[in-house]
Design a protein with these regions (language model features):
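C-terminal catalytic domain of Rieske-type non-heme iron oxygenases
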Residues: 1-196
Length: 196
């Protein structure tokens, strides 16, 4: 994957942000017409933070339905200082997983290294590989453009004093993890888009 302009913490948070897919990747990763309710379980242990999302299939795009099959749960995991994982599960267990390790090139440039793993299925591996590359090329280009825009804005206006809301689950943990500190244990449940 190409290096991206943007601080390592911003790149990690971009990947783990549960809301950005609706705005940055409409119709690719999430439906643009409306957000469907998502039940969220958030768990923090000393050396990792995991969030599990349970959502109905009506919130999924056609591409997700084709590539993720009968997915029932998806999850994101942050392992300090720079590892992120995503998993997609169905009734038979983990169906697909993405592991990304972020490496700082300099203060404002980050290079991600990604590994995609899928369960053996009917499609040949070479076809799955081509589909994954084609789909993620567009998603990655959108993420890189947004990180560059964010870096430009931070350079021009300075780092803002963000207010933390209920869906800002990973932001504070990422900054703690990047400092080499132990994460503080926490358990939380919430529902996103309950009024959708």
């Amino acid at each position: 994957m190409p290096a991206s302009r943007g601080a390592i913490g911003d790149a990690i948070e971009n990947l783990l942000d549960p809301i950005h897919a609706y705005f940055l990747h409409p119709e690719l990763v999430r439906r643009a017409t409306r957000a469907c309710p998502v039940d969220v379980e958030f768990s923090v242990e000393a050396y990792q933070a995991t969030v599990r999302y349970t959502e109905s299939r009506e919130g999924m795009t056609l591409l997700q339905r084709l590539t993720e099959g009968r997915r029932t749960v998806s999850w994101g995991r942050y392992r300090p200082p720079t590892q992120v994982q995503f998993g997609f599960e169905d009734d038979c267990g983990v169906q697909a997983m993405i592991t990304v390790i972020f490496s700082p090139v300099d203060v404002q440039t980050t290079r991600p290294f990604a590994c995609f793993s899928t369960r053996r299925g009917r499609l040949p591996a070479w076809l799955k590989r081509l589909a994954i590359i084609a789909f993620h090329r567009k998603v990655l280009s959108q993420d890189l453009a947004m990180l560059a825009l964010q870096a430009d804005q931070l350079e021009h206006f300075g780092r803002p004093n963000y207010q933390q809301g209920p869906v800002d689950m990973f932001g504070p943990l990422i900054w703690v993890g990047l400092q080499g500190q132990t994460l503080r244990s926490e358990q939380r449940r919430l529902r996103l888009f309950d009024q959708a």
